[in-house]
């Protein structure tokens, strides 16, 4: 529209506000922690709310890769925490809607499994640290490593033999 907000997003929230009054409406984003991109998302959410549309939460699809440092980089983790703070300050919930951490090595190296563990743990630590200021939730993209278009790459908490990986133990320790 003239305000630079994608019309399909505005229309989606108009329809949802009209026909789903009892359903939680979450703006769900698939991307990393790039400040410029998130600036635009936050502007879009404020625009929707200022237009009288209900937005109940922000979701982040955390599809991480071992070659990225997002879940290990203090600056990016601090930015992630600030997003949760902003969300709560604006009366919304924050959801990690789909987390996975893809390792491409076959079989995965122990160092990669340790980075995967740290990534899951770091994200959950931040969520837990923000639980008293508003709703935070955590969901995984899947549980068991297995071949498939969206499941390959040793990305989940259990191996193909249903044995917990180090990341599962890291989550338990973190909680």
Predicted segments, located by residue:
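Active-site cleft segment of glycoside hydrolase catalytic domains centered on the general acid/base Glu
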Residues: 1-43, 68-82, 107-115, 148-164
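Acidic (Asp/Glu)-rich catalytic clusters
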Residues: 14-21, 45-54, 82-91, 129-132
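Active-site beta-loop-alpha junctions enriched in small/polar residues
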Residues: 30-33, 60-65, 99-102, 140-143
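His-enriched metal-coordination microenvironments in redox/metal-binding proteins
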Residues: 53, 62-76, 88, 141
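Histidine-centered active-site loop/cap adjacent to the catalytic His
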Residues: 163-175
